[in-house]
From Swiss-Prot:
It catalyses: guanosine(37) in tRNA + S-adenosyl-L-methionine = N(1)-methylguanosine(37) in tRNA + S-adenosyl-L-homocysteine + H(+). One of its GO terms (molecular function) is tRNA (guanine(37)-N1)-methyltransferase activity. It comes from the Bacteria. Homodimer. The gene is trmD. This is tRNA (guanine-N(1)-)-methyltransferase. S-adenosyl-L-methionine binds at residues 115, 134-139. One of its GO terms (biological process) is tRNA N1-guanine methylation. CDD domains: TrmD-like. Specifically methylates guanosine-37 in various tRNAs. Belongs to the RNA methyltransferase TrmD family.
Amino acid sequence: MSSFRLDVVSLVPEVFDSLRGLGVIGRAFHAGIAELHTHNPRDYATDRYRKVDDEPYGGGAGMVLKPEPVFAAFEAIPVQPSRRVLLMTPQGKPLQQADLRRWATDYEQLVLLCGHYEGFDERIRSLADEEVSLGDFVLTGGELPAMTIINGTVRLRPGTVGTADSLVEESHSAGLLEHPHYTRPATFREMDVPAVLRSGDHGAIARWRAEQQKERTQLRRPDLWAQWQAEHPGNEG
């Protein structure tokens, strides 16, 4: 399998350096499972001041990211056979685990476009295949959403995480939240590990974990629980 290529267009590319040394994600980069490239639109500005923003037409507060340097940075990126271009914007579709899995599985290259300032020139949207948001809130730029996508996709690539089972069992992988985890000691400050987990009965443990997943999802994320029930008709939980 070829290396998973990630290209980020950002005015602050240095913030992505930390990912190269971040736990299993950093090891994936060092092992060649994934590769990270950053592209600063300022390097493609053509005026003497390397200007990348300007006042909005029609007036208004703030500055708008200009299209020319962004397009130039984007067009300088090598194109892989299977590529997806993602625009970070609060107007985008809220990020879901299914999106991360799809991008990590179906594509060999992701290009992440990060806005800044008040916003970006509307014509920049034409570069993107999808627009992505972390939620209904606004940040100063698209770098944190981009870092989230990088982390979330690289960890799903084969060879990054030690065992595939750990990916299957975690929250959202099957539409439910993950079950509780415990480790030693068996008792800590009068809080005990459930006896079933110490019983050695693997069938009972599996049933307990499945019930915990359902209970947690129903209590903490009723929206996910309703969706799971709709996808599993006849299951009473």
